């Protein structure tokens, strides 16, 4: 009888654990499904001028006459639509700072030119605006309520726009991080061990 009771108890524990894991997995999948439409890919470009020396000038005894050429460089980031009605997008300031062009790519592949509404270099935040219909936003949470050890999810475009809306997970590793780089750097960082790669910034 004791053996039977023990077996039933063990089966019940395993079933309960599987049920909890299943619920947890479903909850994460639901969060990802709801969040992804509000996450955007940010593609920026900048015109860079470089001085190049003319090889022909060198051979014709004019070696010190540089020739200026312009190059367009591109960078990638992510953002979150926080106000669908007004087309406001929240991202990191370093993603759009000093860029000549900013393009937003939505989850449905539509693309829009964006304008900068405001920036705060100290907190590394920027607000962009696009004129677009049929977009979804997501509400902002209260960072004062988070706790170390809580699960988090990151959605963004690591490395390439072809990898847009990649989902990674982790936990809150620490809160209130400040002066990581220097005394004038960002304040009150939230640290996470979720995979964050180039292109994820702002998501």
Indicate where each model-derived feature is located.
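Hydrophobic h-region of N-terminal signal peptides that target proteins for export
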Residues: 9-17
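Sec-dependent signal peptide recognition
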Residues: 1-9
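Serine-dependent protease modules
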Residues: 17-203
């Amino acid at each position: 009888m004791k053996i039977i009771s023990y077996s039933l108890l063990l089966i019940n524990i395993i079933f309960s654990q599987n049920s909890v894991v299943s619920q947890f997995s479903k909850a994460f999948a639901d969060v990802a499904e709801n969040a992804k439409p509000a996450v955007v890919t940010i593609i920026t470009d900048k015109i860079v001028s470089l001085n190049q020396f003319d090889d022909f000038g060198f051979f014709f005894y004019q070696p010190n006459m540089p020739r200026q050429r312009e190059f367009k460089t591109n960078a990638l980031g992510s953002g979150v639509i926080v106000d669908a009605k007004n087309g406001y997008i929240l991202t990191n300031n370093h993603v759009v700072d000093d860029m000549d062009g900013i393009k937003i790519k939505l989850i449905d592949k539509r693309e829009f030119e964006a304008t900068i509404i405001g920036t705060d270099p100290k907190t590394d935040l920027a607000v962009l605006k696009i004129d677009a219909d049929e977009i979804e936003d997501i509400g902002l949470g209260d960072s004062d309520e988070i706790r170390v050890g809580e699960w988090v999810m990151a959605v963004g475009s690591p490395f390439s726009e072809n990898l847009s809306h990649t989902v990674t997970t982790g936990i809150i590793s620490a809160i209130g991080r400040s002066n990581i780089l220097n005394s004038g750097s960002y304040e009150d960082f939230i640290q996470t061990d979720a995979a964050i790669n180039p292109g994820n910034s702002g998501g």
